[in-house]
Amino acid sequence: MMDLEHKRISRSTLPDYADPDYFEARGERNPVKPQSSNVVPGTSHIGSIKSPADYVFGDIIGDGSFSKVRRATDKKSWKEYAIKVLDKKYIVKENKVKYVNIERDSMMRLNGFPGISRLFHTFQDDLKLYYVLELAPNGELLQYIKKYRFLDENCVRFYAAEILSSIEYMHSCGIIHRDLKPENILFDGNMHVKITDFGTAKILPPKYVNSPDYTTFPSSFVGTAEYVAPELLSRQVVSKSSDLWAFACVVYQMIVGSPPFHGSNPNNIFKKIMSLEYELPKLLPPDIVPLFSHLFRIQPSDRSTTQQIKQFPFFATITWDNLWTQDPPPMQSFRPNYNIAIPNAPAYYRSNVTAAAAANAAAAFASASIVKHQETARRQELPTVNRFTAPTAHYGYASLRSHQMPVDRLYYKLVPSSESIIESTSVFVSPIPSVPEGNKFPSGLSKMFLKRKQRVMLLTDVGRCAFVCKGKHERLFIEMEVNLKDSSVVVIFDENSSKRFLIEDKVQSWIIEDSSGDVTKYKDKILKFADVASSHQSRSSEENVEENEEE
């Protein structure tokens, strides 16, 4: 049970856990088993065995919206782990208990498979939850893609095989990951794959564990824009085959250097996904092409299964039985055996598409008619793809991080149907009497007296800047809005801080502070509308001067 009034989670809501194999490997009797629901509140089942005091905590090696992952060393065994520390107060406040449980329960179900990051313990104190995880010291797949741009064919083949093997095991246990991407694929000390981040996984009911890959289940929009499958966009459903779509996207990115479906905003990405608009470089190994043509299909039932993928020519040299005991090939760049130059790829960068924008766009996209895309895809035996020499120009990551719920789809109902939301982000709004003298932003003691209110800022394609809050019964409404194209509206960005800006109209002034601490991701969009207002005002002034001269 949750004590919402005092922002507490009882221990029965998130019972502790210890991996049985952890004790058996040491010849110990495991006094703790995965917990049932009849737990006495306020007690810790393994508190006497493991607690924060049993570890030496080191550097932060990862963080999320309500958790941090720290490198830690067991004081008795001196073995290193990655401990995920979660804030209980935030979990309750943001209704994340479900997702915390999903992550723990998924990892408990998958524990022991070599391609899945292992959960050894969970324990807690009054303020925090602790997940003791297997340490993956060699980082994530994305960093190697960034470093080498195009991975060697042998690397791609071996790691694609390990990822596929891990997906096969997940599905056999009734787990759909729903957010497979290079950031969630780690490497252990021997450079073998470790899939992690199960906070948005879907745990299937027992009767559906062995269901066909194309069986669909209702799903909210979770995941990452560049890797989501068409069925999530069109019908708000997910299947085991959705993970295989994402798998194909990851393999493509390993060998090409960028995701197959990318764009400047979520809508562009989703349109490309639904129309199967992707390209293949001319230097791509011919054996790998069927992997993409058989997985990039609109209908889940038209995609190849895991067993069929294993039989593709690209994996002909893979020995599946001892895959996890083999020595991985050295990580290196692709080196063609023939004298064809690979053009220089532009520098890698992350897109400015926010998680909120991706969720909003997905909601809008799902409501649009896409039947024509599906009918076209059904008539095609194989999708038509273009072949080109140069790698794709750029790619980005519109990421919905683990445990982060998508922005409420009702946001789109708050603006006229003729407008599109091009940016949505969490901000703090502080009303002030007027623009500070000399355009100086408050600092020091004066900042303490500002009344900050957390809101969601929506920016539309016509220059509307609206601030949304929740009323009674969780009803969303626009508390205030300004027209950035209005010549009476003043927008000033703080030259000394990248996290805030100021808006003033004829009546009121507000300081807007971005929750993430970075307003640069949408600064240009706002200034573009403000420039339009300035040009209109300038033309109006010139016309008045001309009229006065004629008089």
UniProtKB/Swiss-Prot annotation:
Keywords: ATP-binding, Cytoplasm, Cytoskeleton, Kinase, Nucleotide-binding, Nucleus, Phosphoprotein, Serine/threonine-protein kinase, Transferase. GO terms for cellular component: cell division site; cell tip; cytosol; medial cortical node; mitotic spindle pole body; nucleus. It catalyses: L-seryl-[protein] + ATP = O-phospho-L-seryl-[protein] + ADP + H(+); L-threonyl-[protein] + ATP = O-phospho-L-threonyl-[protein] + ADP + H(+). The modification Phosphoserine is found at S220, S538. One of its GO terms (biological process) is positive regulation of mitotic division septum assembly. The active site is at D179 (proton acceptor). SMART domains: S_TKc. Residues 86-131 are annotated as: PIF-pocket. SUPFAM superfamilies: Protein kinase-like (PK-like). Pfam families: Pkinase. It is an enzyme of class 2 (transferase). It is found in: Cytoplasm; Nucleus; Cytoplasm, Cytoskeleton, Microtubule organizing center, Spindle pole body. Residues 55-315 form the Protein kinase domain. It comes from the Eukaryota. InterPro entries: Kinase-like_dom_sf, PDPK1, Prot_kinase_dom, Protein_kinase_ATP_BS, Ser/Thr_kinase_AS, Ser_Thr_kinase_AGC. The PIF-pocket is a small lobe in the catalytic domain required by the enzyme for the binding to the hydrophobic motif of its substrates. It is an allosteric regulatory site that can accommodate small compounds acting as allosteric inhibitors. Belongs to the protein kinase superfamily. AGC Ser/Thr protein kinase family. PDPK1 subfamily. This is Serine/threonine-protein kinase ppk21. It comes from Schizosaccharomyces pombe (strain 972 / ATCC 24843). The gene is ppk21.
